[in-house]
């Protein structure tokens, strides 16, 4: 299957928005040229956020979002790339798209000379855990995930 990985920018916000709609609602809508909300544009144009999408047959079918956070002190400015979200539409899974998207995190690690890449995975999502392990990620076990 032919595909391309594209960085999300102001030229492809509407296609990205269509994919987010697909994920949230479970069905695909007609491709739109509708303007994306100003809030979404603002978030997607954040220079610290890196969003890439897989494009197949003119539409996006998956994405990864990453951030780089520099560290001070013992890290000497070499922080980590954090994978915030990785998703591929279920009917497109098994084509290597998630692995291709994770390579974008590797590229960011190299770009920033980062110490490493960090992500979290839900304990109830063994498929994702297996994917990450197949891509070289290892369970660290030294952190507790907390939210407020």
Write out the residue ranges for each language-model feature.
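Short, Lys/Arg-enriched, disordered terminal segments
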Residues: 1-4, 107, 111, 148
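Residue-level recognition of the GNAT/N-acetyltransferase active site
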Residues: 84, 89, 93, 122
């Amino acid at each position: 299957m032919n595909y391309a990985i594209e960085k999300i920018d102001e030229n492809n916000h509407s296609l990205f928005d269509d994919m987010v709609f697909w994920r949230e609602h479970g069905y695909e809508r007609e491709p739109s040229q509708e303007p994306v909300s100003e809030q979404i544009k603002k978030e997607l144009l954040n220079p610290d956020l890196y969003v890439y999408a897989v494009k197949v047959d003119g539409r996006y079918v998956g994405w990864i979002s990453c951030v780089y956070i520099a560290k001070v002190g013992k890290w000497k400015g070499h922080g980590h790339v954090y994978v915030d979200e990785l998703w591929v539409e279920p009917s497109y899974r098994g084509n290597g798209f998630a692995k291709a998207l994770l390579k974008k995190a590797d590229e960011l690690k190299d770009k920033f000379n980062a110490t490493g890449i960090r992500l979290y995975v839900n304990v109830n999502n063994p498929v994702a855990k297996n994917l990450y392990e197949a891509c070289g990620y290892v369970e660290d076990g030294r952190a507790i995930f907390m939210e407020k």
